[in-house]
């Protein structure tokens, strides 16, 4: 009897330690954890986001603040993302949210489910969006920043965070990079469109039409489209931004079209080589491309970024990349590199510490998948539809208004500005649990009891709310 009591106390103590020893951020999910959603892949695929938390409805496109309190108004996206606690954000409205200032996502344990918006979905415009928290899932949104407020910035930036996955989003019209994600751990950017950064706009340095800076540790970038950028398609981790994240990075099954002066480059690190896999990507030159067979330009020297440290070139594993118009580079990817010394060549694919992709395709297969299914594709707007056509045809439609040409633009007005998004009508959700009444009725749930969204009636791995959210877009992988 005494032995049984002692064992019980030991077990209770162990359980209390497991519960009470965590920090402020959500713990890193273990490899046996459930996928963030079916189709999630790569380093961030076990992100839990807002699973099991409260549901927050976005009911207005306004970004105004309450005049008496100075706080974001109820029902706004800003109010939803600035709340604390585990939560899932759903949308009862569609259209363009014109931000009045930079939007910071400073509290994690968050899922933003853009696929719930009725009509044509959501576009976020006017200012940068910056993720300053960990354990975040972002899906099916458009980030089209623009130049109307004369600010420098990325449409979306995520730096030095953990457990994040960004899926099926569209980014464009930034005045710096379209989307920069570096220094992150357990991270995925997948099935996104990154297009038409503004080349000669408001950036203090002048020409700055860049795709993105990407990197991290156990970081995956797959099935994305980069199109119509002058450079950084992408750039792998600046050496000075984070000297703790040296990879490995998986850059797999991406499509790059119409790069201008530079395609993919970078990779250098402080005192240690960064580890980068470039596998089965599809490169297609366009009218603005100056070096049509350049696959990658590994950085081996940098006068402004060593900061007193020894600069070490990145170690690249190149395999299966397809260079449109060049059989030589397609057959031997190193023929598309500006540097071919052993200093930049990995002897084998980097795998240690990396969550391997389960959805790898050949470059040619990925080309079709990305163009048909990536981006904010539940309801593609005219911008993404046009760009897909340009990639397929190897053409461009617009020049810039400040001297940029051949698909590289300088302002959203060069392409006709922001399209009007159909508002649609949100389905009735009586108990405000994020699941429409009609869907709850069809699945044997109670449309008058909000608690049933948090439980696992329909699937042992996903809450009932997640089953609904996942089902909306299950055909887009």
Name every feature range the model reports, one short phrase each.
Residues 10-19:
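Bacterial N-terminal signal peptides
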Residues 18-32:
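Bacterial Sec-dependent N-terminal signal peptides
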Residues 35-89:
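Acidic Gly/Asp/Thr-rich repetitive segments characteristic of extracellular carbohydrate-active
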Residues 73-85, 97-111, 121-139, 145-162, ...:
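Extracellular beta-strand-rich solenoid/capping regions of secreted or surface-exposed proteins
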Residues 109, 114, 134-145, 160-173, ...:
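Right-handed parallel beta-helix
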Residues 124-129, 149-157, 173-181, 202-216, ...:
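Extracellular beta-strand/beta-solenoid scaffold signature
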Residues 235, 245-412:
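Extracellular beta-rich repeat passengers
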Residues 412-477:
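Extracellular calcium-associated, cysteine-rich motifs in secreted modular proteins
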């Amino acid at each position: 009897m005494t032995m049984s009591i002692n064992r019980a106390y030991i077990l209770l103590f162990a359980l209390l330690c497991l519960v009470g020893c965590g920090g402020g951020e959500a713990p890193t999910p273990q490899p046996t954890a459930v996928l963030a959603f079916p189709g999630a892949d790569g380093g961030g695929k076990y992100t839990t986001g807002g699973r099991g938390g409260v549901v927050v409805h976005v009911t207005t496109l306004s970004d105004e603040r309450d005049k008496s309190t100075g706080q974001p108004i109820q029902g706004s996206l800003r109010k939803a993302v600035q709340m604390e606690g585990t939560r899932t954000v759903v949308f009862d409205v569609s259209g363009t949210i014109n931000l009045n200032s930079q939007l910071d996502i400073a509290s994690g344990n968050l899922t933003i489910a853009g696929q719930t918006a009725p009509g044509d979905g959501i576009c976020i415009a006017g200012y940068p969006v910056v993720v300053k928290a960990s354990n975040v899932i972002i899906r099916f949104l458009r980030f089209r920043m623009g130049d109307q407020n004369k600010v420098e910035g990325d449409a979306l930036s995520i730096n030095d965070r953990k457990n994040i996955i960004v899926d099926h989003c569209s980014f464009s019209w930034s005045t710096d990079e379209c989307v920069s994600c570096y220094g992150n751990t357990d991270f995925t950017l997948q099935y996104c469109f990154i297009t038409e950064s503004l080349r000669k706009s408001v950036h203090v340095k002048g020409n700055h039409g860049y795709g993105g800076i990407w990197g991290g540790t156990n970081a995956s970038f797959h099935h994305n489209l980069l199109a119509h950028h002058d450079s950084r398609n992408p750039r792998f981790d600046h050496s000075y931004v984070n000297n703790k994240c040296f990879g490995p990075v998986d850059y797999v099954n991406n499509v790059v079209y119409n790069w201008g002066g530079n395609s993919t480059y970078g990779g250098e690190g402080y005192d240690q080589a960064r580890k980068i896999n470039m596998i089965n990507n599809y490169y297609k030159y366009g009218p603005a491309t100056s070096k049509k067979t350049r696959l990658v330009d590994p950085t081996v020297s940098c006068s402004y970024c060593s900061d007193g440290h020894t600069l070490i070139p990145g170690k690249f594993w190149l395999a299966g990349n397809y260079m449109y118009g060049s059989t030589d580079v397609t057959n031997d990817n190193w023929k598309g590199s500006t540097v071919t010394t052993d200093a930049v060549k990995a002897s084998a694919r980097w795998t240690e510490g990396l969550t391997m992709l389960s959805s790898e395709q050949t470059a040619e297969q990925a080309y079709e998948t990305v163009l048909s299914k990536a981006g904010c594709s539940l309801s593609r707007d005219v911008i993404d539809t046009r760009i897909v056509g340009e990639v397929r045809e190897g053409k461009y439609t617009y020049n810039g208004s400040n001297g940029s040409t051949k698909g590289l633009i300088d302002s959203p007005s060069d392409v006709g500005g922001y399209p009007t998004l159909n508002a649609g009508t949100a389905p009735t959700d009586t108990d405000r649990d994020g699941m429409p009444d009609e869907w709850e009725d069809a699945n044997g749930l109670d449309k008058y009891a909000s608690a049933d969204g948090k439980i696992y009636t329909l699937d042992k791995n996903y809450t009932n709310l997640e089953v609904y959210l996942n089902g909306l877009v299950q055909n887009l992988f």
